Amino acid sequence: FLWPYSGMMSGCVAMYQATGDKKYKKILEKRILPGLEQYWDGERLPACYQSYPAKYGQHGRYYDDNIWIALDYYRLTHKADYLKKAIALYEYIYSGWSDELGGGIFWCEQQKEAKHTCSNAPSTVLGVKLYRLTKDKKYLDKAKETYAWTRKNLCDPTDFLYWDNINLKGSVSKDKYAYNSGQMIQAGVLLYEETGDEQYLRDA
């Protein structure tokens, strides 16, 4: 499946950044990235990575899985091709945005039943990081909109932790996972750094 494979990619990227050891760069470029391309689905547009290798046919496409890969590509943007792929994944991710519930990104392209913090919080982070790299204000504007939607719809006002998702009927799944709140903390800090709006810092 794509999810554990992308975790291996994240780990290798982190090791390369932390140590500067070129063996990790070699592993990424010679093994991990070629393997990752086995998941690329260019038949359905916008193109993205699907959950299972494409040679086995079409499978589910998850917005959150593609966010993490796009973030890793962002961290590898010393090559133009990596930035190009990160932007392509960003475009796919935001194809999952809809006006239902006032906005927000769905979790799965084939199961548009609910909108999850795990699809929206890291999309905010990705948007700010792409803005920093490209200086294209559309990324910052969409990051601010995504952050505001997530905070309005999925933040528990009693403890400021984040619920898991809200379905299209307006019912909230109130499970709370550390990675959801953690991504919103990071998003708030990044937005504060780019806008100077102290409300983002207070939120974080």
For each feature predicted by the language model, list its residue ranges.
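Glycan-recognition and catalytic cores of secretory/periplasmic carbohydrate-active enzymes
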Residues: F1-A204
